[in-house]
Amino acid sequence: MSEHERPVEIRALGMDDLEQALQFVWEVYARTEAHARDDEAVQDFLSKIDFEYCAVRVGDGQLRLWGAFSEEKLIGVCAFLGLNRVYLLYVDPRAQGQGVATRLLKRAVFDSKRHDDTLPRLIVEAPDTAVGFFGKQGFVPVGEPTEDCGVWYTVMELTPEP
């Protein structure tokens, strides 16, 4: 069975999964993006995935995470701040292009709508490397790109289907 044919399970992650999820996100970032970023941008990213910072937010329900697993191996992570802000979305490069990120995002939206069925919109500050992906998911830019720590971000929104 090829990597593409393996079944992928999407499930909510909790505090017990946080360290593994953040380590996974760092490993993907380090392999795919860090080389193109300056030291300030890498440090900024590391602060975003700091265990203590994230643990507090998971503990109080502000940060929610989902994982994609293939044969019990973590191959993708999605995190939302609150119900509608995409915080992280990272997929193992070997599993990219197989719909894993799309499935993670859809599950996160589904779970968010279970908490608030009137969810008005989703927001993402998409880095330059992810604008195309989010555009394909129906997100539209709501402003001009802005630069922070050498990385260009575009705020994008999506109005979920009822």
Language-model region placement:
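A short, internal acetyl-CoA/4′-phosphopantetheine-binding micro-motif in the GNAT/acyltransferase core
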Residues: 69, 89-97
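Conserved beta-hairpin
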Residues: 62-76, 81
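A short beta-loop-alpha structural element at the N-terminal edge
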Residues: 8-23, 34
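Conserved catalytic-core motifs of GNAT/GCN5-like acyltransferases
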Residues: 121-125, 135, 140-156
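A short helix-loop-beta-strand connector motif used in the catalytic cores of GNAT acetyltransferases and
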Residues: 50-66
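Conserved GNAT acetyl-CoA-binding A-motif
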Residues: 112-127
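Conserved GNAT-fold acetyl-CoA-binding loop/helix
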Residues: 26-53
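Conserved acetyl-CoA-binding loop-helix of GNAT-fold acetyltransferases
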Residues: 97-110
